[in-house]
Amino acid sequence: MGQSKDLRRSLLGAAAFSVLMSLQPAYAQSAGNNARVEVSIEAAALGDSLRAFSAQSGIPVIFSEKQVDGKSAAAIRGTFTPLAAVERLIEGTGLRVVEGQGGTFVLREAGASGQPSTRAGDTTAEPARVAVSRAPEQLPELRADTVVVTGTSLRGLAPESSPVETFSRAEILGSGVTSTEQFIRILPQNFGGGSTEFTSRGLPDDSNSQRNFAFGSGANLRGLGAGATLTLLNGARLAPASTIGDFVDVSMIPVNAIDRIEVLGDGASSVYGGDAVAGVVNIILRDDFDGAETSLRFGSVTQGALEEVQASQSLGRSWQGGNLLGTYEYFNRGSLRLADRPDIQPPTLLNGGAAGVTEFLDLLPAQERQSLVLSGRQQLGDRLSLSSTAFYSDRNVSTFGVGIANTITLGPSRAQSKNAAVTFLADYELSARTVLSFEAGYSENHSESFSQVQFPAVAAPVRDATDSSLWSASLIANTELFTLPGGPIRAALGGQFRREELINRPFGRPVLRNGERDVSAAFAELHLPLVSADLAVPGVRRLELNLSGRVDEYSDFGSTANPKIGVLWEPVNALRLRASYGTSFAPPKLGLSGALDLGGGVLRYDFIRSILNIPLPDPSLAGVNYLITSGTANDLEPETSQTFTAGFDFDHVAGRHDLTLKGSFYDIRYEDRLGITPVPGNLNANFAPGFAFQDPSLFPEGTVVFFPSQAEIDAVLASFERPLIFAGGATSATNIGFINNVALTRNLATTETRGIDAQIAYGMDADVGRLTARLDASYILDFTNQASPTTPVVDSINTLYNPVDLKLRGQLGLSRGNLASNLVFNYIDDYATSSAPTAVPIRSWSTVDLILSYEFRNARTRWLENTQIGLSVTNIFDRDPPPVPTQTSFALTGYDPANSSPLGRFAAISLRKSF
C-alpha cells in the first residue's frame, strides 16, 4: 500500500514538474538546425529518402506526394548539416528547400516565389509535431511525418549510445519477402526458433513455444525467447498471442502498411518497462500517403503445390494540416507437405515407428489472412495536433500434423486469430520548448484452435480459446532545461498506466490460465550534450550522455526500478564510439503466473530408452515405469537482467564512393529466467535420469526423484490440473521407478549470452549505375544456462533447435536507371545435435536469393507510369535444409526449423501501381 502511495506521488510530481517546465524562461538559444547529423540513406524514391532522413535526423520534412511523385534520390552517407543533407537528396529534382518554424523543412518548386531560406541556426530545432499553418508560405496538401524514435521518450531525438538498425519501406519490400514475419526471420540478430508457424508443437528447449496453438510468429532477438523481445506497433504495445501471452504475433501485421522497422539491440526497460530484455522491434506504419496504390503478388515453390497470393490496396488523402490513409491487405498461402520434400525424414511417433501417411503431413500450414489499417492526423490551430491509428487482422490456419501421442496416422488442426488495436495521440505545445503528449490505446487478441484426437485418452477433438487484452494511457512532457557547452539539455518526464488480462479456456474443460495485472509507472530521460564540434576540443568532436530511468509498480509482483546510462564519443568526424548499461525486469507472463496447467504422463522406461538409445543407468531401473511432469511450477519469481553494449559506427563519403562500418558487442546476464531445467550436453529431458543417477549434483534437488514412495506419487498426481496420459505401453501409475520434473517450467538461476554484430556496406556511383555491397554478421560468443547456483553450466550454443554461433547475410546490388537488382547470400554455420561426445554433426547451410525490379518512370504509355514490376527467387539453387534426427515428443521432422527452412526454391512476381 505504501508503494502505491509513493508511486502516485511520483506521478503527481511528474505532472507538476511538466507544468513548471512549461512556465520557465528560455535560458539559452537552441542549437538550431546547424548541428550536424549522421545519415545513411540508400538510393530510393525521393519520398522514401526524405522519410528516411526524418527518421534518422529527427527533423520533419514537409512535402506533398505530388511534389515527389516519380522523382528519385541518390544515396548519401556521412555527416552533414540537416539543410545540406536535404539539398543533396533533392538535387536535380526541380525542388528547393526552405526552413519553417519549429525546426522543419518545407519543399517548394524551384521556380516558386517565397521567402528565402533562413540562416541555419536562426530557428528553433524542436522537431516535435509540426504546426503546418505556421510555415512561411501556405502550400496545398502539406503534411509532416510523425517522427517515432525507438528506444527513447525524447521527441525527434535518437540517442546514438545504443545500437539501432532502421529498415526502410524500400528495403523491406525489396527483400523478396511477403510478410512481416518473413522479414523479421531473415535478420541476423533474430533467432528463428521459439514461437513460429514452423513449430506448431514447439521446441524441446523452449517450453513457451509449446503453447503456440494458433501458429503465430514472434520476434526472438538474441535467441532469448520471444518473451524477451518487446514488439511495438508505432511505439505502442499490442496484446500478446499464444495461450500464455508471451509474444506479439508479427505475422498479423500487413507488410504493405509498414513504413519502416527499427530494431534496438539493447535492453530498454528504463523506457518501456518490462519485457525489453533482449531488445525492441518497433514496427512503424505508413501514415502519409497521398493517392492510391495497388499491389499484387503471386509466388510458388518450384517443387510441390504451395502457392502464395497477396493483394493490397492503399488509399490516402493529404490536406493542409492533416491526412488520412487506409490500407487493406489479403494474403493466402497453401500448405507445404512433407511429401514434396522426400529428403526430409518424417517424425517418429511415440510407438517407435515413423508417421506412415506423409502425403498429408504439413511442414508449413496453409493460411488466409485479411488485414486493415486506418490512420489519420489533423492539426488544430498552432498548438494542438491529433492523430489516431486503427488496426484489425483476421487469420485462418489449417494443417495436418502428428498428435503428440498418436500411434496411427495424422490429424487435422485449424486455428483462427483475430487482432485489433486502436491508439489515440494528442500533442500540445505548451511553449516553444515544451510539448505535452497524451496517448491512449486498446488492443486485443483472440485465438481459437481445433485439433483432431491428440491423445488416446481424449475421445473428442481438442478445442482451445485464448483472449488477451491491453489498455494503456500515458502522459509525457518533453522540454529543454538549460544549455551546456555542447548544447541544450533535452528532458522527457512522464507516467503511464497499463491493464493486462488473459484467459485460456479449453472447451469442455476447466480454465487452464487466467490472469490480470495493473502496471503503473513513472519515468524520466535526459540527453546531455557535453561537448560539440563548435568547441574544437582535440580528440573530442562530440560527447553525449544519455540517462533514463523508470519505476514500475505491478499489482501482482510489487515495484521495480530500472536505470540505463549511455555514452556517445565522437573523437573525429565520421567515427562514433558508444556504450550503454542498463537493467531490465520482466514479470512472468500472465499465462504463466495464472497457469492451471500442471500435468504429466506415465511411460515405460525401456520403451523410451530404445527409441533414444539411452543406456540403462542401473539394473534396478530395468522394466520400470516413470512419471514425467510438465506445465508450470508454483511460486514463480520475476525475471531480471543486466545488459552491457559497446560499439562503433563509421561513415565516410569520398566522391562517388561511400563506406559504412558498424560493430556492436553485447553481454546479457538473464537471472531467474523461466524455462525448463537444462540437461548436460543439451540433451533431451529423457536423458536426465541417467545423468542424475550417476551424479545427483547435476540437477537441483527434486528434479529427478528415484524410487518415490506411494505418498510422493500420490502427491504429484493430486497436484495435476490436467488428465494423466499413458503412452509407450504403460497402462497405470504403478511400478514407478522415478519422477522426472525436468520439463516443468520454473525459474532458472541464470542464462548468459555474449556476442558481436558487425556490418560493412560500400557504395559507388559507377558508369554502369549505383553499385552496392553489404555484409551483416552475427557471432555468438557464449550462450549458457544454469539451473541453480550449485549445478554445472550447460552450453546451448551450436546445438539442435538452439542458436548457431555464426550467421551471415551478404548483398550485392546494382541500380541503373529504372532497373534495380540485388543478389543475397545467406549462411548459417555448422553445428551438432548436442554437445555430448556422441552428438551427430549438422552441416552448414547456405542459400542464394535474387531480387529484380523495374519501375516505369516518364513512360510513354500513361497506364504504365508509376508502375513497378518485380521478380524474386529465394533459394535459387533449391538447397535442402541439413538433415537432423527427428524429435519424438514434438512431432518434428528431420530438419531444424529454428535454423533452416523446408521451403526450397520459391519464385514470385509482383506488380505495384501508384495513381
Question: Which residue stretches match the model-derived regions?
Answer:
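N-terminal periplasmic "start-of-domain" segments of outer-membrane beta-barrel proteins
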Residues: 29-37, 60-74, 142-181, 200-201, ...
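Short, acidic, small-residue-rich periplasmic hinge/interaction motif at the N-terminus
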Residues: 50-57, 110-173
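N-terminal periplasmic accessory domains that precede
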Residues: 105, 183, 187, 217-220, ...
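Extracytoplasmic beta-strand/coil segments of soluble accessory domains associated
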Residues: 105-108, 156, 185-236
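Short acidic/polar hinge/loop motifs at secondary-structure boundaries
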Residues: 219, 236-265
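Transmembrane beta-barrel wall of Gram-negative outer-membrane proteins
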Residues: 287, 303-443
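Short loop/turn motifs that connect adjacent beta-strands in outer-membrane beta-barrel proteins
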Residues: 288-291, 320-321, 380-383, 429-435, ...
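C-terminal beta-signal and adjacent terminal beta-strands/loops
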Residues: 669-671, 781-784, 826-832, 854-915
